[in-house]
């Protein structure tokens, strides 16, 4: 994994939402998930519109270098946890007889098979061709902009944890508007860029996440590409492990002492007696003040489910 990242190609980019090249740096982190500390990636915020994104970011041609060999394994194994998630995801869908649905980032089609058994006509698209594929599910492989679908064809389009990974969300919004029925819904799960998990605890999956959407930014994307926001749900329930900000007090305290990320993640730092006492109180604050249910209540949890309707003038 680390040797592959040495060949990573990075590119500076303008804001996908407004096109401005003016931004300010918010913070930089290495690949904490896979403990690759060779390079730190910068999260920036557009000065013009406020959208947050990675710049420089891995180029599209080199994105495969930042995915661990086992990264996609769980996407193709439909276990009890996944089945429970399918039930929760389906609750966001409308009740439509013989409705046509497209799932972007469908992996092997497990969610679509679940929906097919409930009467949906199912289609999928995924940029990774998996070894495992559900029988009877129409899946096209490649990025959405590389695959064609009829205009006004789908009643519902879903994308569960996809939009934060794509280089040009604007292109996706534009295409989805064209292939979605005028009364259709675009339903997608994304990390909440305003959450404790994302903004303050440094837990975003950087550099695989390259866009960091906030509610006001979603509303602006919707406006620009012919949608209106029907509903935003702030939830930690879709995954067995909540996207919680727990640990943020500890992490931010250690970073304030200029302790390198490699020592923080590997828990190999030394503190003076005074700093140990302060660190102990940070752990207490994390335990007492941060809880997934409270994060949901105050819209500070790590995930949002967004439902967009087409804005027909």
Language model segments and positions:
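N-terminal juxtadomain amphipathic helix
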Residues: 1-78
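Hydrophobic anchor at the start of a short beta-strand
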Residues: 23, 122-123, 229-230
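Conserved SAM-binding loop and adjacent beta-strand
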Residues: 74-88
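Short low-complexity, flexible loop/linker segments enriched in glycine and/or proline
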Residues: 40, 71, 137-141, 202-204, ...
């Amino acid at each position: 994994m680390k040797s592959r990242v040495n060949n990573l190609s990075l590119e500076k980019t303008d804001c996908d939402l407004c096109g401005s090249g003016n931004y300010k740096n918010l913070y930089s982190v290495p690949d904490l998930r896979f403990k690759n500390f060779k390079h730190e990636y910068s999260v920036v915020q557009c000065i013009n519109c406020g959208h947050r994104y990675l710049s420089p970011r891995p180029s599209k041609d080199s994105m495969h270098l930042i995915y661990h060999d086992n990264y996609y394994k769980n996407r193709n194994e439909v276990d009890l946890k996944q089945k429970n998630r399918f039930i929760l995801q389906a609750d966001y869908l409308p009740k439509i007889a013989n409705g046509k649905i497209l799932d972007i980032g469908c992996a092997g089609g497990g969610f679509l098979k679940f929906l097919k058994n409930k009467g949906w006509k199912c289609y999928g698209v995924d940029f990774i061709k998996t070894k495992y594929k559900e029988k009877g599910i129409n899946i096209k492989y490649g990025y959405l902009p590389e695959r064609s679908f009829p205009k006004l064809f789908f009643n519902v389009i879903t994308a569960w944890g996809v939009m934060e990974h794509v280089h040009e969300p604007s292109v996706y919004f534009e295409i989805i508007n064209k292939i979605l029925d005028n009364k259709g819904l675009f339903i997608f799960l994304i990390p909440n860029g305003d959450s404790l998990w994302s903004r303050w605890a440094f837990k975003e999956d950087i550099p695989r996440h390259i866009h960091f959407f906030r509610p006001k930014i979603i509303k602006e994307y919707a406006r620009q590409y012919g949608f209106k926001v029907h509903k935003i749900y702030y939830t930690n329930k879709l995954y067995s492990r909540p996207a919680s900000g727990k640990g943020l007090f500890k992490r931010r305290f250690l970073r304030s002492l200029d302790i390198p990320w490699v020592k923080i993640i590997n828990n190999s730092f030394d503190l003076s007696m005074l700093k140990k006492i302060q660190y102990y109180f940070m752990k207490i604050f994390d335990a007492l003040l941060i809880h997934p249910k409270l994060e949901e209540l105050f819209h500070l949890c790590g995930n949002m489910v967004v439902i967009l309707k087409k804005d027909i003038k």
